[in-house]
Every structure is written in C-alpha cells, then in structure tokens.
Amino acid sequence: MPTRANKVETAWSALLAGASETRQEHLAPSPLFILRQTLFCVLAAYLFCGAGMVWNDWIDRDIDANVARTKNRPLASGKVTTAQAFVWMALQVIASCAVLHVMLDGKDVHVIPVMIASMLYPFLKRPTAKKLHIYPQYMLAFTIAWPAIPGRAAICGRDESFGETVRYCLPLCTVVFFWTIYLNTAYSYQDVVDDRKLNVNSFYNIAGRHTHLVLVALVCPILACLPLYLTQFQSTWLWVTWMGVWTAAFAVQLALFDAKQPASGGSLHKSNFVLGIWTIVVCSVELLLKARVSI
C-alpha cells in the first residue's frame, strides 16, 4: 500500500483552487488562508492515510508474514499487538476527523466515500474478489483520488455545491486514479513472486509478463485527462512544469522499468513520490504568481 506521501493531490487541488479564487475581484481569499487550509488538508490526509495503513496491515498480517518484503512489519512480525494497533488507528482517525471538521466548516459528508473505500480495500485482495474481477488497486486508487474534492472544498466549499466541486475536480480525480494504479502496480510488482505463491488478488499478478505494456496503457489516460484539468487555469507555468515534466518523467520511468527485475518497480514508485512533491511546489508557485497579479 502506498505511503502517506501519496496524499499530495489534496494539496494540489487546494492550492490551485486558491490560485483560481485569487483572481476574483470581490471576497478573494488571502494567500495565508489558502496556505492554512492546504496545510489542514495535508495533515488530515496524512493522519487518515496512517490509519488506513494500520487497517490494511491489520487485515493482511497473515499474508504479510509470508512475504519477504513485509514479514518484518510490526503486526506481521508480532512486535505490535492487534489491540495496540487498533488504539493507534482510532487515534489517527479521530484526529483526522477533527481537522476535517474545522477545515470543511462542518461539511464532513465529503469524506464518507473515502472512509468506506478504505475499509473495503484490504478485503479485495482475497480470491473471492478475484472471481468478481474486482482488484484492490481500483479501491486504493479511489481512496487516493477522492481527497482532491475535500481539497477544493476547503477553499471553495462555502460558495460551491457538492456537485460543482466534483465537476471541477473530476479530471484531476481521474488523473490521480490512474496514476495511483500505475505507481501501485509498479510498487507491488516487487512482491510478485511471493504473491503468486499465496494467490493474492492483484492487478500485477493478472498482467504477468505484460506488466510493462499495462504500465504504458495506464499512462495514457493520465496524459489525456491532465490537460482537461489544467485548461481551466489558463497558466503557461502549469503546462510547462506539470504537464511537461510529468510527460518526460513517465517516458524515463517506462524506459527504465524491467519486468524481469521486480525491484525496478520500487525505483519507479520512488520516482513518482518525487513527482508528487514537485507538483506541490509547482502549485505553490502558481498560487504566488496569481496572488501577485491580483495585488
């Protein structure tokens, strides 16, 4: 399961919503308000993702104990009891919900879908889900993509309906959905040998020797939907530093990935971590540029 760092899209969404709002002639939010809300978004996502990781490791502890890369995880190795894990998970959920309640001005309904999806995710690795052609990457991608909506709502929620917020965020959610499947397929491919022995239901197990082609196919909707999102901001900066850099990065990643070397999936995942942080910087600069113009 991806690390907490993969919750960067909520920051992208909040920062660019703020950049767009600063162009308003009346009642435009201040850059400090936008940055504060963005920090709340990141903190809430970080805490909730931490809780989700504990939940995932709790349900998967028997599987993880039989996989070389994961057998030393706290729950799988027995270093942490299930009771201790539950308390830590509950504390993170409570803290995350408290931050979200303040950030969204009480509109907590925005986070219900991602809570349900996070609870279901680990169960989709079981053979039963495989029979229904449901793979855990679908649910994981949804849980990573959805926070773009609370991210925008943190800035525009008082003036937009839920439907309007979803409409603005849909292209970004689609980008992040396929991006998550892309990087998770590569990341999880490191365990392909052990997971096949355990009959773990996962996308990369189905892809088999065609994993490289699957990764190429997953990049296509990312690069197709990203322009749909960036068009609304009318920013040359975003086109060059986001669209341009992502396109070049994907080309390099796909060239270096080797299906015969499962460890190369880890390198691809790390590269996308850097890409996510880079995009936060890009969106922050866009906010500053728009704020300077509006002064």
Curated annotation (Swiss-Prot):
Required co-factors: Mg(2+)
EC top class named in words: transferase
Enzyme Commission number(s) from the entry: 2.5.1.-
GO cellular component annotations of the record: plasma membrane
Pathway involvement of the protein, from the record: Secondary metabolite biosynthesis; terpenoid biosynthesis
Subcellular location: Membrane
Keywords associated with the record: Membrane, Transferase, Transmembrane, Transmembrane helix
Biotechnology: Diterpenoid pyrones display various biological activities and subglutinol A shows insecticidal and anti-HIV activities.
Any Gene Ontology biological process: terpenoid biosynthetic process
UniProt keyword Membrane present: yes
Membrane-related topology note: Multi-pass membrane protein
GO-annotated molecular function: transferase activity, transferring alkyl or aryl (other than methyl) groups
Transmembrane portions of the chain: 39-59, 84-104, 109-124, 131-151, 168-188, 213-233, 237-257, 271-291
Function field: Polyprenyl transferase; part of the gene cluster that mediates the biosynthesis of the diterpenoid pyrones subglutinols A and B. The first step of the pathway is the synthesis of the alpha-pyrone moiety by the polyketide synthase dpmaA via condensation of one acetyl-CoA starter unit with 3 malonyl-CoA units and 2 methylations. The alpha-pyrone is then combined with geranylgeranyl pyrophosphate (GGPP) formed by the GGPP synthase dpmaD through the action of the prenyltransferase dpmaC to yield a linear alpha-pyrone diterpenoid.
Stated family: Belongs to the UbiA prenyltransferase family.
Protein's UniProt name: Polyprenyl transferase dpmaC
Organism from which the protein derives: Metarhizium anisopliae (Entomophthora anisopliae)
Recorded name of the encoding gene: dpasC
